[in-house]
Amino acid sequence: MEPDLRIALHRAVLADMAGSKPKRLARAMDYQADDMPGAESFASEEDFRDALLFAAPVSGGQLTDMWSKQLRAWDHIQDPAWSTALPCTDERRTDIYSALGLEPSTRKLLDAAAPVIKVPGPVVISKEFVPWYATHQGKSWYWPMYAELLSRKGWSDEAITDLDMATESVVERLSDPTRPEAYQSRGLVVGYVQSGKTANFTGVIARAIDAGYRLVIVLGGTLNLLRDQTQRRLDKELVGRENILRGASEFESDYADDPEWSQGKFVEFGSAPSVLGGFDIHRLTTRYDDYKSLLQGIVALEFEKQEPALPLYDPQNLHRASARLMVVKKNKLVLGKLVKDLKKIRTPLAEIPVLIIDDESDEASVNTSRPKPDTERTAINEKISQLLTMLPRAQYVGYTATPYANVFIDPSDAADIFPKDFIISLDRPKGYMGAADFHDFDLDESDEERTYANSNELAHVRDVIVADDDDTGPLRRAMDMFVLTAAMKLYRAEVDGLGPDAFRHHTMLIHESNWVESHRELLGRVTKLWWQAGYSSAEGHARLRELFDTDLAPVSAVRAEKVSVPTSFDDLQPYIGPAVMNIGADQQPIIVVNGDKDLETGTADFDRRSIWKILIGGQKLSRGYTVEGLTVTYFRRRAANVSALMQMGRWFGFRKNYRDLVRLYIGREEKLSTGKQEIDLYRAFEAVCLDEEAFRDELKQYSVMVDGMPQITPAQVPPLVSQHFPLLKPTTPNKMYNARLVEVQSPGRWEEPTAYPTSPVDLRHNTRLWLPELESLAAEPIQFTYDTKKGLSFPALVGTVSATHMCDLFEALKWSAPSQFEPHMTYLRGVTTRALIDDWVLLAPQHAKPDKRIRLDSTVREYCWFERDRRRGPLFGAISDPKHRVIAHYIAGGTGRSDDPHTNVLCTERRGVVVLYPMVERDHRDVAANSGVLEPGRVVMGFGFVAPEHAHYDGARRVRFATIDSSRDTAIIDS
């Protein structure tokens, strides 16, 4: 173990450098040793090298741990004055070592202890903060143990490194728990649905308690099911057996009947952590018991002080005290009990470093154009606000699966929990199957060229179109696929030698409604279908054979990764019977998960047993609840808005060894709950996914520091969100965000407005603005080759428009939400008046076949029209075609030279590109197709543009905001 003086010396050295830059180590150690009697013998690079050489492995060695944190902090810094190398590169690390003046042998040891992590890391939007974490004086106990556990579970080194970086990014932005003056840091972590957010906040808790946070409150969803799931996960992977038992018998544990408890799968330390040099965790909630008033057991909330005269947050007390952990349901009564108990304890609340983790922090739906006040949510937020007021050292970290969290939509709802300090957007994890795997966002191939190999939609998505509610055909096919994929899993487990635990769970999710009465009817319908399916009969096998030959086999032939695929149905047939038996075991093939005890025909407890079942559910399966082994989803949710779609993406997740088997059966002509209007759920979901990815890309772009300062702060994120949801209004009009988006510079980047007007008057106005430009285009289309290797091309009419004329046209356009385009207009106006752009190429793509052509108004020429629909209220989904964007980027100079001569001849350095799409919505397509003439008020003139790559000003900054009330330094103000 390293001498305390050596640790103290290096801590002082790193604390001095943490806030600035790497400096000559020898000189820094000499300087710090002057104030530390006896430290002179440790103030040399030779001693440092020896200490590194004989340090404990990864899980130990405070010296190694401190230096690893600081080196990685320097690795990640964007644009530091002391290095021109890119972050997270060998070149950056070389610059660090040179600044420290280290010898080659020392560098080699540090590289072994803290290798350069060459992954992009999370996207961070943050205020400036005081560095403290790299040199904290706590005990590195639970985080190394957790990282080691993940490694044993089969996590790759890369995945653990990703988690390491992401959790450190969160914890370093919390307040130093030993800081004399209290400060509340509030942040938000944005993950993906079913992507492992729990692993992230478990890591954050581990790091935070190691650093000194002594009360951790996890708000684990609004349902018992979610709270219980979170409690067990934390107990199993963080708290550990010794902290759970606290000297009691194994058989007295609340997990005594849990198979994984008896199998030794809960983390173990060998003895109580406090005996081994760490510290204990006291649970204030258990597997099935939410927080309850402690009464005489109030002492459980009391913190022991070794030095009574000093505050708890003093290092002499803090690092000797045990941590308290509770997982609490987000319920006003439960939170009320906690608030009441905290008021009773003797330990001054102002002394306790607290971490509040809010899982699924955007619990209420936000994507609605007319939000209604939610009294329960308001009451819960009031209790959270009370906790934050009572606990001045409390840090609040919310977790959500969508960047459009409620906290950015409604300032009246977010005033006390707004993430004022940081927003961290996690990278999509490796092996994750998400939105991009079910959609063809950027597929260039035409419909005729799409195959199971190149089209995610063809491979994984199956249309559900029913004549009426009695039409069970699509549901039966989905259930047949569920049985087939079950047999495939058994086949792979045996043929590939994957073992019995490879496919511990195999599930199908049916979601049609949140209403319990609907579940009752659906349970009867599905039960009848199951028992009448005849899976052991010749007729049933003939049906399965046909589905195997036409669907499963051709997809798996091109999509299976390193796993076996039967050459014929005959090879799979022996596994059908065992698969059906597994699903129908205990005569209950179907589980309803909705809280109605009368309907619970089986328990969906994935922790305690292997589950091969069909699940029917609504709310309980829509937020946070992890459906393990999910392979087939049948989704027909009848709703007036698509707000729940992102959270309802239960079909996302990790699908090791069965990605090719995953199927989504989704309604394509679902009637809305109001009126006769229909909605294509797949396209609606696609629109939300596209918008979310665009927003994540924006956060990534704006997270890059400019001149050592952040381009945007968390307080400026709400106006970015409003760009994507311009029609949303707060529930309380007198509260507003204190920032307004003024300008978005987008040189070399494709931009695509979606908020086109709905009124015929405004549509007619816009169409007549564009008609002269259309009429001025060349008479014959040019054939643009966007993929020379495959010989793929498309025709387009081409013309050029002066910069000032195009700017005037943009300025005159009408919008359903002018605020969406205005920041882009400010930029376009800016590059035009500064003469940074000469002209624009106008492209009007044409169809290869002579169909879908119309004349507009009194035009002589015919133009191709495009089928496009509004997906989120008045907002359109995707408008442009990926192949058109490829050519636009080439011409505007964003992607180098093209191999296509027709493209290259149009390229100049100061030229932008506009791609124009005359769009016809569903109601007018018959007229357009039959008459070939359309009144301008029935056409939506959609477009996208790319400004020249070098058309920018104001340095490297790409976004500009204005403060609404400059006298207020808060994100939310009263208007």
Predicted regions and their residues:
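C-terminal accessory/interaction regions of large nucleic acid-associated machines
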Residues: 638-659, 796-975
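C-terminal catalytic or substrate-handling cores of phosphate/nucleotide-
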Residues: 309, 329-330, 464-501, 505-517, ...
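Conserved RecA-like P-loop NTPase helicase motor core
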Residues: 590-673, 679-680
